């Protein structure tokens, strides 16, 4: 059994912290963007171009996606996990540095961003989601590693040798389900 003791803060300058979770977002977005550009460039030369979006258009799309991830992820957390608190403390919603994002809110934000972008640029929603589905696992991978580092989203109690004791969940070992995904 392993006892989870990872610090979610990578760098602490006292007045400013850099957390593993923010690094996961940054890496996921940058590596996803680079991989998408590689896919787009390779299919531009192919007569079976399934992507039908240029690298310049994808660069513009990234701005929409980042906004969708951040706003959707935060609002998802606020609505699904702590609506009562945030309805009483409305100004706390914008304090992203205090934590609180949700995958399903981020996903909804991304879908809305793609809908807006596709209508504005007159590009098929499904052509955009084709490329997004290829690169999204990169971001999800880094996000789940950050969930493990944060000691959140742990699995059921387990007696397996690779189970992890997450102190925030009590003394019972649990599946490290974050890294299974």
Predicted segments with their positions:
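Hydrophobic, membrane-interfacing alpha helices
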Residues: 1-180
């Amino acid at each position: 059994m392993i006892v989870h003791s990872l610090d979610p803060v990578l760098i602490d300058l006292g007045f400013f912290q850099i957390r593993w979770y923010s690094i996961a977002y940054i890496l996921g977005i940058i590596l996803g963007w680079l991989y998408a550009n590689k896919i787009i460039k390779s299919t531009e030369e192919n007569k079976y171009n399934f992507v039908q979006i240029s690298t310049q258009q994808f660069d513009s799309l990234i701005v929409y996606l980042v906004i969708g991830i951040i706003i959707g992820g935060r609002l998802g957390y606020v609505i699904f996990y702590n609506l009562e608190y945030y309805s009483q403390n409305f100004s706390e919603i914008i304090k992203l540095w205090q934590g609180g994002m949700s995958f399903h809110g981020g996903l909804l934000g991304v879908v809305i961003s793609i809908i807006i972008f596709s209508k504005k640029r007159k590009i098929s929603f499904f052509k955009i989601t084709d490329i997004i589905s290829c690169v999204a696992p990169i971001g999800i991978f880094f996000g789940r590693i950050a969930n493990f580092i944060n000691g959140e989203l742990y699995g059921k109690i387990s007696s397996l040798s690779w189970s992890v004791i997450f102190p925030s969940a009590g003394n019972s070992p649990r599946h490290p389900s974050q890294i299974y995904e």
